[in-house]
From Swiss-Prot:
PANTHER family found in the cross-reference section: MAJOR EXPORTED PROTEIN
Chief location category: secreted
Subcellular location: Secreted
Pfam families hit by this protein: T6SS_HCP (PF05638)
Keywords: Secreted
InterPro entries, alphabetized: Hcp1-lik_sf (IPR036624), T6SS_Hcp (IPR008514), T6SS_Hcp1_domain (IPR052947)
Keyword Secreted: yes
Stored Gene3D superfamilies: Hcp1-like
Protein name: Major exported protein
Amino acid sequence: MATPAYMSITGTKQGLITAGAFTEDSVGNTYQEGHEDQVMVQGFNHEVIIPRDPQSGQPTGQRVHKPVVITKVFDKASPLLLAALTSGERLTKVEIQWYRTSAAGTQEHYYTTVLEDAIIVDIKDYMHNCQDPGNAHFTHLEDVHFTYRKITWTHEVSGTSGSDDWRSPVAG
């Protein structure tokens, strides 16, 4: 089973949008101590591509960052995220902390993804068919799509990092 990640979101209007999002009142029995001001990320998808000519394989344009898409359960932050979407609120920082099981058998924060100057461009709320027994373990979910100006990836344990900022040209 995959280990979930945890995300915090700070907006220019609402401040810490994820404050209290992972408390018992917000998520019920899935609450875990230590992540109270974050949302649990159940799914993640992100692509960065360089367009290429199908014949030659040569690049035909600049890098393209597609939206970061996370899947999360409905929680205290859900209405605030929808408000950020509908108002076009700029998110100064979106931080996703990735966890894994260490060699010692404990959970360790080993990787971080940070988005700067992000906005929410799409939210899809959904519920799987509750009459289908195969969906018994699903709850109410939402996919949140973020675009951003800058992204930074950091491997916390190994001490490596990389980033891309649309304001800075890529060095050739």
